[in-house]
Amino acid sequence: MAAVFHYGTDSLTVSDAMAIAGGACKGVISTDTAAVVKRSESAVESIVSSGKTVYGINTGFGILASTAISASDTATLQHKILQSHSVGVGQPLPVEVAKLMLITKAHSLAKGHSGIRLSTLERIVWHIDQEAIPVVPEKGSVGASGDLSPLSHLFLPLIGMGELWVPASNKQGYQRVAAMDYLKAQNIQPLSLGPKEGLALINGTQFILSFAVKAVQRLHNCLEAADIIGAMSLEALTGTKAPFDARLHALRPFAGNQLVAQRLRLLLQNSAIMNSHVDCDRVQDPYSLRCMPQVHGASRNSWLHLSELTQIELNAVTDNPVLLENGEAISGGNFHGQPLAIPLDYACVAAAELGNISDRRCYLLLEGKWGLPVLLMKDVGLNSGFMIPQYTTAALVTENKTLCFPASADSIPTSLGQEDHVSMGSISGRKLNQVIDNLEYILAIELLSAAQAIEFRRPLKSSVILEFAHSYIRDYVSFASEDRIFALDIEQVVSQLRSFQFVKQVGQFAKESGVSLNQGFEQFEL
């Protein structure tokens, strides 16, 4: 990954966007980008001076599109649209999501099809560099005509309104300040928006897109973790790796299935635990063990679909109207969020099912079968063992099921019927990340349970990779010989999942051991 990203000309990826948001990469405006932005700025000036009626430049918005606006009022119109459309409610977005909105919007505007002035684009990039991130309410977008309300809040600070998150004076987190106060402290004047700029700023899918970017990264991490954790559960339950045979999966060649089967084979190779029961009389394992390639693999296929479409949207122009290279303005529907809303809802089901099958493995670990003690503790009765953590997975799995209703299947007409079909993709994006929040906890509880269960297979050891995974978690959570506050253990483990460190460290160890878990399936890499 390059240390510098050129807005408008480089191809933006999920990793790039997250790197810019995290400060590992700097986004800049190149001379080529400046030229195309100035070209579209000139096109707007020509339209205004010609007196030609073009939506959003010298007309009202939505149902008011037929209302002409005089040339003297076009600038006022742009300020009014930011104020009138700032109607969001609810909690503020996480700072990282709001920052991603700025980054993805800057990249889209930098393509030179929106008619925005170079000075306005530069101010947006200044906010990113300064980490002066607008306060944006989480609710209020219907996902067409773009994410109007959240984007309006996002750009209020450009005109000296709204609020900002800025780095706290003690360097710990952010503090919330009035945008105008911050601009004054920086000796920066608010912008006076030109024709079309207000509409260009708030028309787009960057709210939906930013949640998609987060989800692509987070769900990928969960998918990688689920295979490792599932393999640990299989070992603890003395399951067989026979259902992961490559010849079997070649007969039903879904790429996700084949990848998961390969990963499980490699994770389990040369395991003394596995070799100890090769000749046992157990014919088949329960589905939650045997069908990991089919279930985890289906979720991977869904992730791949979302990842591919997110990549397209990251480099798309979702404004309306758009300005072509010849200065022609075309009014269309690139702002409609449906292309992301549907795959986000699809991924919601995929993430929920990953949690569903994980909960089933948690339950298997507690049953006291195949040589494991009931509830994974020897002195139960006095102790409840790992009984109650599975209550939490059951609750989270059920909550995820309620979040799987596809928001994109619903639509409520807005703007007096002019905008008569909307995507609700903003809800799809938010609830997918809620499902992933729950999924991370479910996987953390399975990892706790599997790590506990493997201890009862000693002195036999698992594969070198799974033993590393086990010892890694043991650095944070010890074996439980009696009851304790397991919520503290869960938080320790989930922090390792959410920081991506568990997957990163296990993957790095595998590579150092000469094992490439995803070889041949590079399309599933982030």
Question: For each of these PLM feature ranges, what is it?
Answer:
Residues Y55-L77, S84-H107, P137-I159, L191-I208, ...:
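FAD-binding core of FAD-dependent oxidoreductases
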Residues A2-G51, Q78-P137, V216, L234:
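Glycine-rich, flexible loop motifs
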Residues K38, A65, L148, L416-E419:
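Short, solvent-exposed polar/charged micro-motifs at secondary-structure junctions
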Residues A2-C25, S30-T33, S40-V48, T74, ...:
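C-terminal auxiliary extensions adjacent to catalytic cores
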